[in-house]
Amino acid sequence: MTVCGAVVQRSGSRRCYVRQLMTPALQDLYAPQNKCFGCGPANPKGLRIKSFLNGDVFVTTFMPETHHEAWEGVVNGGIVGCLFDCHSNWAAAYHLMTRAGTNDLPPTVTADFHVKLRKPTPSKGPVIVKAKVVESTDDRATVEATIEVDGVITSTCRGTFVAVKPGHPAYHRW
């Protein structure tokens, strides 16, 4: 697997579908040792998504492999949920950091998220996840996100992500 801008691609089988939006990705810039299954750069068996900011929308492109499928040609719903959870959490954390006017990314956790699987997500091409913060306070952000393939939205998500304080089990875990 190689990273091409915001696109994870199989060796030689795909070209870049999305131009590089920000270098490096948020995960590489703020948490290079993170081992999270969905977004950890240091997890060789994880999804290793790369989140980029494009205007006020956060974008990641994921290239599914056969072991990410529920059945042939369709991404597993758990993988869809993981993409939403991790990518939306990064959108929330970065938003809260810029809202506070600092360069310190706050450790955030998922308070809740609701996924609507509108139709099967095809696994034979790039899966584009877009997330946007729609509400926020000093310590929490609500994010709405979509997954699309070939311009068709296959699922949506709305979640709340909260910055945690010292003493919380997730404080600076990534």
Regions picked out by a protein language model, each given a short descriptive name:
Residues 2-8, 12-71:
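Non-catalytic linker/capping segments at the edges of enzyme domains
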Residues 16-27, 121-128, 132-174:
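HotDog/MaoC-like acyl-thioester-processing domains
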Residues 32-33, 47, 56-58, 104-113, ...:
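A generic structural signal for short beta-strands and their flanking turns/coil linkers
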Residues 45-48, 61, 110-114, 128-130, ...:
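Conserved beta-strand residues within beta-sheet cores
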Residues 52-54, 118, 162:
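A structural detector for beta-sheet-dominated domains
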Residues 59-86, 90-91:
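A conserved, well-ordered hydrophobic junction motif at loop->secondary-structure transitions
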Residues 62-64, 117, 163:
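Hydrophobic residues in beta-strands and at strand termini
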Residues 89-128:
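Hydrophobic beta-strand-centered segment that forms part of the acyl-chain substrate-binding groove
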